[in-house]
Amino acid sequence: MTKQKGTILKLKNNLAIIMTSDCKIVSIKRQPGMYEGLEISFNKNEIINKKNKLAFYSRIAAGIAAIFIIMVISFNLFNNNDVYAYVAIDSDASIEFELDKNNKIVKVNYYNDNTNTVLDELDLKNKPVDFAIKEVIKKLDLNESVILISACLKEQNTKKSSASDNYESEKLSKLIDICKNAVEVNVSENVESKVVEVSYDYKKLAEKNKLSLGRSIVYEKAKEQGIALNIEDIKNKSIGETLQKVKIDDVGVVHNVKKEEPKKPMPEKPEPGKPEPQKPEPGKPDPAKPEPGKPGPEKPEPEKPEPAKPEPAKPEPQPQINDLPKDKTIPEEKTIPNSGVEPMAEPIVEPKDKQQEKPRPDSKLKLEEKPTVEPKDSLEEKPVTKPKDDKKEKAKNSIEKMP
């Protein structure tokens, strides 16, 4: 192997940085006795390449990451199969589900031999809990029975840091909502059931007494309330019968579940001004519905609209002097004794179109241009009398008074 010569420029950690005779900078592993400025000879295989070093470390990092991913996946699979919560269904029979974090069934526990034989054929493992509740109600014909569903989290899940408490409570609330909806949809309208969320302590008591979670709650409450019910009574009686004697409303959080009745259509309100239709009395025929074979009541004829009232006739305008025929003479004006006051002529109302066309007459000539016209009858009956001379009358009276 050919050797190269170079001078040590710098010593850094376990490396010696060398400048070769052809002015290249390379690194080799540091050896004892090396110092800066020393001329040495070295082989090409002693040169440490940075790219090769980076690729080596990259391979190591990728291997570690792959191992970590495999560990996480296997850990999640193991945890998903681990029991996270318990849900018990108690009615005439009792059955309990062990659930994982996804609310899927890991294991089914039976507390009645008859229930075991009936439900074994369902194969509820790995099924969602709402599907399992629906199938149990349908298979055991519990839609007319009172159902008690109890739920709790496993103890190891409740002993966590305060930061995860909200997450656990949300998971339990979601599980309770799933159970409530499953019961409400699949039971009858007249049956009221209960969904209860309790602590893990009741699950411990249930395992001790070999009862389901729901029946263990009823048994403990019966002892607190002084009700004479032993474990055999709790096991054999239906849950609806025991709940009539034992009150469990103060245990954990209790949700009363009842199917909503279908809403009846609201009666139509009559329009304002229209009379409400009269309901026929019981036993009497409805007048609106004619009997078969008989003609129905005659329909009233529609009211005819009233004819429009004629408008009152407008008074005809009085004829003017200029409009009179030529063969008729204008009667003379009545002369009134001189009393020092000029008589006022009555105003004559003309149509609007003529008032606009005619110019306004002079006020001084008003009496002469527009004298009053009387009817022909009155002119013939009342002749015009000339006024007497006042001076002649006075002279006549003075002659008559003389002796």
Swiss-Prot record:
For the region Disordered, give the residue spans: 254-403
Q: Which InterPro entries match?
A: Anti-sigma_RsgI_N, RsgI_M
Q: Does the keyword Cell membrane apply?
A: yes
Here the segments flagged for biased composition (Basic and acidic residues) are 254-314, 324-335, 349-403
Instruction: List UniProt keywords, sorted A-Z.
Output: Cell membrane, Membrane, Transmembrane, Transmembrane helix
Q: Name one Pfam family in it.
A: RsgI_N
Q: Which domain of life is it from?
A: Bacteria
Where located?
A: Cell membrane
Occurrences of domain RsgI N-terminal anti-sigma (ranges): 4-51
Q: Which residues lie on this side of the membrane: Extracellular?
A: 81-403
Q: Does the keyword Transmembrane apply?
A: yes
Topological domains, Cytoplasmic: 1-59
Give TM segment ranges: 60-80
Listed GO cellular component terms?
A: plasma membrane
Membrane topology designation:
Single-pass membrane protein
Q: What does this protein do?
A: Anti-sigma factor for SigI8. Negatively regulates SigI8 activity through direct interaction.
Subunit info here reads: Interacts (via RsgI N-terminal anti-sigma domain) with SigI8.
Q: What is this protein called?
A: Anti-sigma-I factor RsgI8
Q: Which organism is it from?
A: Acetivibrio thermocellus (strain ATCC 27405 / DSM 1237 / JCM 9322 / NBRC 103400 / NCIMB 10682 / NRRL B-4536 / VPI 7372) (Clostridium thermocellum)
